[in-house]
Structures are given as structure tokens and as C-alpha cells.
């Protein structure tokens, strides 16, 4: 039996401060659901899995750049037996202008079972519009920290579990205090700091950290949880980022941003590499490993 997932401190505190959760069994599904198969979105390259939330299948993106698991508003409205929480007096912090709703439900994701999982509810229309196939939500590090998974972009294979044939080395990274990790890569003589963000299709780097310098101005369509829009921005000249001992993202051309914009290591930089996550007892985010 897989142990119940740990909750983030502020949510655990909120739940135990006056809310008692009833043991509500999830409704049985009418057909078997494959919880183990991962697919890659044809347009944006994020990895998607089917999960069961209170027994209902939901297509969820694996997003190491998200602190919390989130359901799209329309998908959340379809749930049965969910416990909705009053959020009117809660303080939320994040990069969205939306005020999230919150529900408690059973979440089955791959090999993991979180019987009473807090799930944010937000409008994900902007995110969904960027993808080839629409998703119901996002699996954040609140659940992913406890699950092993592998993105093997050498072979085009994505799966729950860890590989047996990869020479893995620790990703150069540190915790950011919210369950996520900040990659501390090396580009030439400069350190490059980026959020590890498998929910992003592109890599974005602070201009002053990109050793190869600026390239050309390009037009790009970018999206976040609130907006999807076309903008013009600078692209960096091609360069390499060392991500682990002897492992580098080679020949990448990241988008360049100023200090007010969050830098991120996206799925484009992981092409040809193997990214592995291993849960650990002594870390809120687990251990990320990488191979060439």
C-alpha cells in the first residue's frame, strides 16, 4: 500500500485548523483506466498522464514548475463527492491574478494514491489553448515530489519509475522553498539560474547570465496560467548549459528576459537528455538526476 502523500505546510495547517474530512469513497470507474502511460504533447512537448480524481479520469500535465496541483474550472465542476473549501479568508501567493478555489479529493497518479489531496481550481484556458490536446489540469510538486518518473528524450520514452541503463548524475540544483528546484547551470564562465519547469516548452534565461550574448529579435507565442499571447523578444545566440557533471544541454537558443521575468529550464533544453526524479525521505522535492 502506497503511503499517503505529504501536504505542504500551509495547506496542512489550514486543514487541521477546523476542517475535519469525512472518509468519502471515490466512485468506481465504469471502464479500466490506464494510469501508467505517459504521452508527449505534439505541439508544446509537455508530458501528460491520465489520473483518477475521485474516480474520474483527468488528463494532467506533469509540471515541476508548479508548486500545487491544479484543475481547470470546467473539469473540477464534473467531480463527484469533492469537498470544497471556503477560501475567502485565505492568502494566496503566486504568478496569477486569479483567486483560486480549493477542493479536497482522492488523487490517483501513476503509482501514487493521495486519499485527501488539496487541489487548486483555476481557469486554465490559456494553458489549454497552447497545447495540441487539451488537458484537465496540472500535477504539481505537491504530488510529484513523492513519485518516481523518467523523461528519456534520447529514446522518446516517458514513464513512472526509474531507468536501469542510464549513467545518472545529480542535476545541479537547489531547493527554492516551495517544493520546486532552481537549476544552477554553467554557461561558459557564467552561472545560469533557472526554475526546473517541465510545464514550459521553452527555456528562458536572464540576459546578463547568457554568455553567448544576444541573437536576433523574434516573434513568439508565450503562455502562462492567465494569458496566451504573441510578443517580440530577444533570442540568445546558440550555447551550452552544463546541467550536471559531464551533462550539458547543447546548442540551445533560449529566450532572454530581464530581472523582472522568471527564468526557467524548459522541455526544449532537455532534448536528447534523460531527466529522472527519485523521491527521498529527507527532501521536500526529492532528487533530480540527469544523463546525456
Place the predicted regions along the sequence by residue.
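Pepsin/retropepsin-fold aspartyl endopeptidases
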Residues: 22-292
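Bacterial N-terminal signal peptides that target proteins for export
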Residues: 1-11
